[in-house]
From Swiss-Prot:
Ranges annotated as spanning the membrane: none
Organism of provenance: Trypanosoma brucei brucei (strain 927/4 GUTat10.1)
Annotated protein name in UniProt: Elongation factor 1-alpha 1
InterPro entries (UniProt xref): EFTu-like_2, G_TR_CS, GTP-eEF1A_C, P-loop_NTPase, T_Tr_GTP-bd_dom, TRAFAC_GTPase_members, Transl_B-barrel_sf, Transl_elong_EF1A/Init_IF2_C
Region (G4): 153-156
GO biological process, one term: microtubule-based process
Amino acid sequence: MGKEKVHMNLVVVGHVDAGKSTATGHLIYKCGGIDKRTIEKFEKEAADIGKASFKYAWVLDKLKAERERGITIDIALWKFESPKSVFTIIDAPGHRDFIKNMITGTSQADAAILIIASAQGEFEAGISKDGQTREHALLAFTLGVKQMVVCCNKMDDKTVNYGQERYDEIVKEVSAYIKKVGYNVEKVRFVPISGWQGDNMIEKSEKMPWYKGPTLLEALDMLEPPVRPSDKPLRLPLQDVYKIGGIGTVPVGRVETGVMKPGDVVTFAPANVTTEVKSIEMHHEQLAEATPGDNVGFNVKNVSVKDIRRGNVCGNTKNDPPKEAADFTAQVIILNHPGQIGNGYAPVLDCHTSHIACKFAEIESKIDRRSGKELEKAPKSIKSGDAAIVRMVPQKPMCVEVFNDYAPLGRFAVRDMRQTVAVGIIKAVTKKDGSGGKVTKAAVKASKK
C-alpha cells in the first residue's frame, strides 16, 4: 500500500431522473467494497422482478433501503477506490432527508458530483426553474462544498447518440449556471459518461473519440485533497451520553475540529460544566488523541449523565471554549414553505447534533441569493426562494458557532411540517458569559498540573 491514500467524502447531486443511482452504483460496483457474491445476489433479485436493466441502481437501492430501515450497513459498501484516493459517498439524494443530511450530516462533503441527464428534454427539465439541478448546486455551494465534477450522463441515449454537439451545449449552459452560483468554472471538470454502459466512467470510451479529457475516476482523482481542521480549537458535538458500570459517564460524538487528549480539561456548552477527560476510546481501543473525523467515546470524571446531553458541545477550557448562544445572525435561504414567514416564526433548527426551536426574532434584510447584496431592509415577510439575514433566538439553551470559524457548527436546517423548509449559515453569534458554571474537582486538580 505504501503511502496512505487520500480520503475524500463525496455527495452526489442532480435532478431526480438524471441517473445518479446508476452512475454511483456503477463506480461502487467496479471499484468498490461490494463483494461479487453480493452483486450476484442483487442481480438475481433484480432479474426476478424484471428489473435487470437496473442492476447498478439496484445496488444503491438495496443499500438505501437498508440505511432507511436503520440498519447501519458496512460503510465499505459506499466506498470506492482510485489509484490515489479512497472515496466515500456520504449521501445521495432520493433519500428523504437528503437536504437535512447534507447539513447536519455526519461528515462534510469534500466535493460534489453533479449528474446531468443529457437526453433531449431531460436536461431542460433538470435545469429549468423548478428543476432540482439548480437547487442542489446552490445548496452544495452555500454549505461549503467548493469542488465539483459535472457528469453529462446518458450520452448513450438515442437522442444524444454520443454526440459532441449536445455535450458542448450542456457544458455551456451548466457552466453559466454554476458560475452564477459561485463555483470557479475553470476548476470544474465536465465528463461525458454513460452510467449504464460505463463509457468514460473508469475507462476511456471508444464511442466518443472527440472527447480528450479525463474519465470520471481520473477527474475525481484530480480533486484537491481536503484540509482537516485539526489546528483549530476543539469542538465535539455530543451524539449521546452513556452511563457505563465501573467506568462512569461516557459522552459519545465526533470530533469536528481540533484535537482531544486524555488529561485535557474540557467544558461542555450550553450545560456549562467543566471537567477532565480521563480516557478516550474508538472501536474499543484506547486513543492517545482524537482528531477531526474520529467518532469517539470518552470518560469524564465527576459528571453525571444528568449534567450533559445530546446537542451539547465539548471544547478545551483553555482554548476558545464553547459557550451558550444568547442569539445569532444567519443567512437563511427559504426552500419550500407554503406561506409567508414573518418575525416571531419559531421552527426547529437542526444544527450539528442539536434539535432546538429558534425564533426568527428579526428579519433584518432580504438579500440576493447569489451576490448577498441587500434587496430590501426589514421586510415584513419572506417566502420560498428568498434569502434573508435573520437574527435568531434559541428557545432553549443551545451552542452554535460562526460558519467561517467552525463550519459544522455553523450550518443548520430549518425543519417544519416534517420537511426542511430552509437552510442557513451563521454569520455572527452573541455568546453568554460562561463564568459561574460547574467545575468538577477533577478539573481543578488537572488544571494545577
